[in-house]
Amino acid sequence: MFSSRIWLLLAVTVGVCLAVPDLDEIKKNLRKHGPDYYKNQPKMNENTVRLLKVDYWFRTESMIYDDIDNKEKDPSTVIAGNFSFETLHHDVEGGMLGRFTLTQCNTDNCGNPSPIYIAFRQGGNNAEHILKASDESDATWNFLYAIVNTIYTPAEYGEGDEQTVDTIYGRCFVNFGRPEDKRFRRIIEKCDLGYGTNFTKFEGIESVQYDQDVWYTQNTKVDADIIMVDAIEMLAFKSPLHEKYGFTLESRTHVEITNRTRVFVTSYCNDTVPSAKCAEQAFGAVRVGGKLYEHVKIAQEQSNKLTKLIGTYRRHLQDMGDSHICEKHSLLYSQIAQEARLAKRQDWEAAIQYPENDHVLSLIASALGGVGTAESITTAREVLLTASPDYLDDLLFGISQSSSNNEKWHKQLMYWLGSLDKKSEEYWKVANTIATVLNKRCEASTSSLNSCNKGKETIVNKFITDLTAGGVEVRVLEVLENIPIFGSYTFAKKFICETESEDVQKAALNVILAASKNLYETQLTHKLIKLFRNTCSQETPTSHSQLAIDILLKCVPDHQNVATLILRTETLNPDDQEKWHYLYKAIEASGNKDELKAEFWSRMRKFKVFRPNFLHRALQADSHVHWQEIADASNFQLFSTANTEFLQKSFKRSIFELSMKKGRKEHNLFSLSIDTEHLEQFVTGSASSRSGAPQGSVRIGVAGHKLPTHHIFKGSTDLLSTVWEADGRTHKAFEGHVPVRDVRLSVPLLSGLTLDVDSVGAISMRVLASAEVSLWNQRSNAKAEAYTSGSLHLTASLYHHSEPVRHVESTISALSTFTTDTRAIFETLPYDFCLRTSNSNVDINQKTVVQDQIGKHKKKTLNRKRVHPGVTYRLDDSTIRQCNSYLEQFRL
């Protein structure tokens, strides 16, 4: 009882103390308004609350420019005027309801925005609910929403000063600094912009930087009001490929208090009513979102341009012909691929069934495949493949290059595969494509890759299980090469150094070679060493030994014992000179590519037992590995690797790969694998113990996807037919388009304007091949030309009240041709030949268009061009020796 009285007394004391009037405030009001000021005040009752109305003056300025040198000359958009902020309600949970209203416009471009209501959390200014007046039909971004977004933070209440959260711009880092000298600071940066399409195949080809810096000045004497706000906002799209590419946007906002009024009114809602609910009940406000402003219109409505762009591409193709490509091929395809995502089924039906589009159906099929939705698969099967089944390959290539990671799309692909006969060619083509699609699903993030490798991805497990259920086939392993995860690796490893056929073991080695070195373990390395040493139960072909070398060298230096096991096998009388020559060249190539590996092998050779000897220079062999850097600029390294095997002076197989590396991430751009069997009996005139029917096959890989193997000839009859048909005519070996950039986003600015940005990019490639064999002159000439076009295109449009203000376009394109020319003389056996590899001039064009959409509509166009001279690439020592021999024969 006594304690209860003490607590009651303390409560009364606190209440009395808190009720003591502010004498300084009373004296101030008496001096200002006279002695009758308090007599004339309305009588307050228990339903009367004290609220605030604060008047502010504001000014915002926005500008977009293509180059910093033009910043001072370019126009800007200014909005200035006055607005008021009113407090309307406080709830018991610490929430507060405020209203922002335009009171005056000084620049005649403010429009007529309706008041905005915001429910926020006191203490941290955390925005929770945004509401609009009921008489406003559509909520469209304007400067009132911008002011609200400037003052209130998207950070979560109570989660600290530094957070990475979802904002209206995307997922961003938000820092709300503690007060220093009456000033707070909010920084928003490191944003993953946009909630729509934001795809980049090669990280770093286009950099996007968004920064927001807001300073708040507080009045610490009277209720801690914000008396001044200064905000700076910057958005820049740039590319390391060209310093003039892109644009920069800046906006600045200044807000300053002009008046502060206390008002006493009857409370609008009971304090138990949440602030957002009070806005709806008392003011009829309608919610338009939370801190993400979900139902506020930001992006401008645009009609779909798919049909128009396809028509433009068709006319361009008619004017230019089909012999080569230009920068417009890749540019137009990238735009078509972007519009394809928003196209409806009737748009596709119209494009596919339009008679004049027959010669561009390959492009339409590729774009449809790249959409990556369940609806696109249905449209492709029911419309495209029903009317034009010959375009299955183009459709599948488009699917393989899609950036989509849609679960329903993956299931539709699996349903399609399940409906096909496993004995049909279509089944294996579709399976080969699905393997690449699911591999992208696994590589989407570190966690998803771990999930795939641990067998936790149901759809991936089902695909591999169904594919391998019918037993082992070479085609099964070729498909698994496109999805080299742990399940594929484990399946392939079972056939290494076992009793399976040579073709199966070779295909299994290719799967393991494609897999990550993180999957390799001691059991595998021991099997590979046995292959290399030719100590398996079956005799090991040289091809298998060389593939084993390629895999073992990937292990180094992670598995350091591998180097010891290899070098211990060295002798002065090697069993297979081609194998050992290939090993030494492969070690040299790996050292050229990676300095750490070069240092590792150098240290190994310093041991007395492993010191190099005359054997390295005395080998009479032509098999080799050649690594060559092509370009290194802007942190991108472009290089090629060529692996070639010879058997008894005759060509056996080769793998050429063109790759790009940025940081630790390596991308395969193009690969060409040529494989032959049993040709030595025709080339050298001698039959080996492995003699059989001659075979030749080719497999092309583009942007991480290996196409199905194409068999050139099987048997002597096919070989002879191929030779007779080699009359020098040019054939199209491959044509395809690879999207590399697809971004579409709308950015609401703190100045009240909005910015729509579209960024697209693609690489187009056309490979033409020709071969001529003259049995009379005993000469042959084979030529392959890869015409390559790449484009990156960016458009940025600044809008004010949905009206265009300024438009910037920036484009960069590159065009070049890669050529290989092989000539041979077969007057004597073994024949002599020479290979020449070259690259034509690299033409780089950059174009910028800046156009004002108001006033005189001034337009500025800038064209810039650079030409990098073509080069003929240095050959490996073995190839140089062969070329010298060829030239000697040619002179004779």
Swiss-Prot record:
Disruption phenotype: RNAi-mediated knockdown suppresses the slow germline development and the delayed egg-production of clk-1 mutants, but does not affect the rate of postembryonic development. GO terms for molecular function: lipid binding; lipid transfer activity; phospholipid transporter activity. InterPro entries: MTP_lip-bd, MTTP. Pfam families: MTP_lip_bd. The keyword Iron does not apply. One of its GO terms (cellular component) is basolateral plasma membrane. Residues 1-19 form the signal peptide. GO terms for biological process: endoplasmic reticulum unfolded protein response; IRE1-mediated unfolded protein response; lipoprotein metabolic process; lipoprotein transport; plasma lipoprotein particle assembly. Keywords: Endoplasmic reticulum, Lipid transport, Lipid-binding, Signal, Transport. It is found in: Endoplasmic reticulum. Catalyzes the transport of cholesteryl ester, and phospholipid between phospholipid surfaces. Does not catalyze transport of triglycerides. Required for the assembly and secretion of plasma lipoproteins that contain apolipoprotein B. Required for normal expression of klf-3. Heterodimer; heterodimerizes with protein disulfide isomerase. PANTHER family: MICROSOMAL TRIACYLGLYCEROL TRANSFER PROTEIN, MICROSOMAL TRIGLYCERIDE TRANSFER PROTEIN, LARGE SUBUNIT. This is Microsomal triglyceride transfer protein homolog. It comes from Caenorhabditis elegans. The gene is dsc-4.
